[in-house]
Structures are given as structure tokens and as C-alpha cells.
């Protein structure tokens, strides 16, 4: 896990619920600090004009819903990068498109990712992308592999969520409600149809399992809930691999 601290993030997402869900998950993780929200590309530049450069983001999350063509995506990314020096642009897609992946790479983005692949791991993903030239997610890899050329051969595939196989479904649900969503034990107990004591037992066991699988060090002032959130939403570093496009036919071999 990369423990960057205080990465400033701006989120551009046309969907109100998506915008605020991403904001919420990033707020839980002290590695990231959301500095601005907007639902339009134009809103990005309007906000930048009103703020001092010291307030500008280190990372820009960009939704493509209102971007109609690959050329437009490339142009938007290029414009953002021309305005903000060294910014990391992360493109989030609903459905992966090969031509948009190439446009993101050509524009200088550091990631072209399917939202459902990223999931709860959005803060861990942003931290991980700080040291990656260009990444795609597993959903993008599956869709584009049969049709793309070798221009994406340098892309790295985003790791999936750290698995924690010992976590049962009920423990996962309790952690999701109490750690990720911030519910009290009483409210989570009502949601799951068990006693608050049982919820606390689930959480305690979940903490133990995740801590046993984690070799990272955390700041002393970080609460147990914060550490649990970071562990639950961590990436599986052992799953990192490079995108491998399909092999081209070997011209030295006789063809039928």
C-alpha cells in the first residue's frame, strides 16, 4: 500500500450520486482530500480560475458520460494537463471502449478504469496511480484485448481488492455497514437482523483477520476504524501485472 498523505483530488462526474459517493469514500481515507466537485468539464476550469494555484488538485477524476468522442476526451485531458502542472488525470468509465482507452493514453492520463472495477478501492487506486505511467482495469483489459493493437503494451492492470478469504459474508457486511458506511452497531444490527453484540463481535473478528494479513505501518494517531477502512479497501499488490496484447502472427512461419 502506498501511504501518500494529503493528495488533493478534484472530481468531475455528471451523476449526482456518483459524485458524492466518490467524495465520501475519499473523505474516509486521509491519503486523499477532495478539494472540489463538479458535474461538468466546464466546471473544472471555472473552479480553477477562482482559486489560487496552491489550492489546485494533484489528481483529477474525470467521468466520460458527457464526452462524445475519443478526440474530445484527448482534448479535455490535454487541456487539464496544460493548465495544472504534473496533475494525474484518472478517467472513470461505465463501459470500456478501446478507442477511448487509447485517447486517454494519448492525452496523458495515468488511468483508464471501469468504475465497477475500482469499487471501494478509489483512494487506494489514486495512491497507487501516483507511481504508474498508465493503467487500465481488468474490465478494460478483457474487452480491449481481442481488438487492440500493441500501443497499450506498456499499460499496467489495476490490482483487484485485497481478498481476505477468511472474512465471511456476514463479517464483510458488518464491516461494510459500520466501517465503510459509518453506521452505528445498533443501526447495523437492525439492518442485519442480529443483536448489537453480534455486530461488535463481527467487527472485532474482521479487524483481527485484516490486521493479520497486513504488513503496513500506520500513523499512531490513526483510529482503528480508519485502519480497518484502509485495509478493507486496499489493493491486492500481488495481483499487479502488465497488459499483454494478443500476439501478432509470426511472419517467419509458413502460412496456410
Regions found by a protein language model. Give the residues of each.
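Charged, solvent-exposed alpha-helical segments that act as regulatory interaction surfaces
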Residues: 135, 150-158, 212-216, 238-241
Amino acid at each position: 500500500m502506498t501511504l501518500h498523505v494529503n493528495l488533493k483530488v478534484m472530481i468531475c462526474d455528471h451523476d449526482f450520486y456518483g459524485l458524492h459517493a466518490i467524495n465520501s469514500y475519499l473523505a474516509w481515507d486521509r491519503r486523499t482530500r477532495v478539494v472540489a466537485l463538479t458535474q461538468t468539464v466546464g466546471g473544472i476550469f471555472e473552479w480553477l480560475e477562482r482559486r489560487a494555484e496552491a489550492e489546485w488538485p494533484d489528481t483529477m477524476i474525470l467521468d466520460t458520460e458527457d464526452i462524445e468522442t475519443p478526440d474530445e476526451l484527448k482534448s479535455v485531458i490535454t487541456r487539464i494537463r496544460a493548465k495544472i502542472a504534473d496533475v494525474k488525470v484518472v478517467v472513470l468509465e461505465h463501459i470500456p471502449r478501446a478507442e477511448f482507452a487509447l485517447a486517454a493514453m494519448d492525452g496523458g492520463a495515468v488511468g483508464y478504469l471501469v468504475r465497477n472495477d475500482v469499487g471501494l478501492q478509489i483512494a487506494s487506486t489514486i495512491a497507487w496511480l501516483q507511481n504508474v505511467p498508465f493503467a487500465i482495469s481488468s474490465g478494460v483489459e478483457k474487452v480491449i484485448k481481442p481488438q487492440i493493437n500493441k500501443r497499450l503494451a506498456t499499460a499496467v492492470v489495476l490490482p483487484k481488492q485485497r481478498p481476505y478469504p477468511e472474512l465471511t459474508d456476514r463479517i464483510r457486511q458488518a464491516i461494510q455497514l459500520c466501517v465503510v458506511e459509518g453506521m452505528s452497531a445498533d443501526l447495523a444490527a437492525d439492518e442485519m437482523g442480529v443483536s448489537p453484540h453480534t455486530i461488535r463481535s463481527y467487527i472485532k473478528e474482521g479487524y483481527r483477520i485484516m490486521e493479520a494479513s497486513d504488513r503496513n505501518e500506520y500513523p499512531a494517531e490513526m483510529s482503528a476504524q480508519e485502519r480497518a477502512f484502509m485495509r478493507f479497501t486496499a489493493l491486492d499488490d500481488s495481483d499487479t501485472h502488465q497488459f499483454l496484447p494478443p500476439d501478432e502472427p509470426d511472419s517467419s512461419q509458413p502460412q496456410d
